Amino acid sequence: MQTTYRKLAKNKKIALVAHDHCKQDLIQWCQTNRTLLQPHILYATGTTGNLIHQETNLEIKNLLSGPMGGDQQLGGLIAEGKIDLLIFFWDPMNAVPHDPDVKALMRIATVWNIPVAMNIATADFLISSPAFQQETEIRIPDYQGYLKERLK
């Protein structure tokens, strides 16, 4: 597949997601990094977003809770180029009923080549990267080229 580039603005659109056993870790991470997160546009699945807002007072655009379709909503936003970065603290020790949705979310984040952090260490690396604080580009699939090729 051919590729093209997409600009990520200085103020990123960041998705925040956490499984139940990881919510407190994500809330604490957001609290620790509140100043760095504040200028960005933050999205979250329902329960996680409400808890983060309550504890940090960060403005969050809440979607549905993950099991109710929030993971799929995020996947749609990623495919539309409306999410630049995904912070997803997931619990590798416990299966969740919506595991297929989680797998689909991770797949679509990989297809569209957005940075993804699945643990605190990686989230710390992302947020401390110079690219986090400035405009940058990522390589993405050339969907128009893909479509043109398929419609020949």
Curated annotation (Swiss-Prot):
Catalytically driven reaction(s): dihydroxyacetone phosphate = methylglyoxal + phosphate
Protein name: Methylglyoxal synthase
NCBIfam families assigned: MGSA, PRK05234.1
Protein family (similarity comment): Belongs to the methylglyoxal synthase family.
InterPro entries the record matches: Methylgl_synth, Methylglyoxal_synth_AS, MGS-like_dom, MGS-like_dom_sf
The encoding gene: mgsA
Swiss-Prot/TrEMBL keywords: Lyase
CC per GO annotation: cytosol
Domain MGS-like residue range list: 6-152
Annotated active site: 71 (proton donor/acceptor)
Positions bound to substrate: 19, 23, 45-48, 65-66, 98
EC number: 4.2.3.3
Domain of life: Bacteria
UniProt-listed GO biological process terms: methylglyoxal biosynthetic process
Function field: Catalyzes the formation of methylglyoxal from dihydroxyacetone phosphate.
